[in-house]
Amino acid sequence: MSTPENRPVSFFSLFRRGQHYSKTWPTDKRLAPVFIENRVIRATRFAIRIMPPVAVFTLCWQIALGGQLGPAVATALFALSMPMQGLWWLGKRSVTPLPPGTLNWFYEVRTKLQEAGQALAPVEGKPDYQALADTLKRAFKQLDKTFLDDL
């Protein structure tokens, strides 16, 4: 699922990619010190669940109390934009090419999967974070939990 480096990704497809990336990324505690994805995914899921009711409550409260509608609408729009910001960041991260250190680690995990007898599709172009998420998800399913200790 790597994208070629020279092809731009549309604004709205970043949201879809962010949602897919959040579902693909393994939420293992041992990955948290190295990757920020666990925290961003948790915050985004929380915002998706909580911010729409907060926006509705803000509007209803201001209307019921006879307050000004402008600040209430601005607050509601801000609350509704928070989950979108998380999904956009995750989508942008999913198409970001891996840095050299993480790239070496990515190939080591792929090698471990191949040594375990797993058939892997060849990597197209420069691997990105989505390819890393797919590989890690498969490694957590197919390999024992100690594969991270050796790396």
Swiss-Prot record:
GO CC annotations, alphabetized: plasma membrane
UniProt keyword annotation of Transmembrane present: yes
Membrane topology category: Multi-pass membrane protein
InterPro entries reported for this sequence: UPF0208 (IPR007334)
Pfam families documented for this protein: DUF412
Compartments in which it is found: Cell inner membrane
Transmembrane segment boundaries: 46-65, 69-91
Family: Belongs to the UPF0208 family.
This protein's name: UPF0208 membrane protein ESA_00924
Organism encoding this protein: Cronobacter sakazakii (strain ATCC BAA-894)
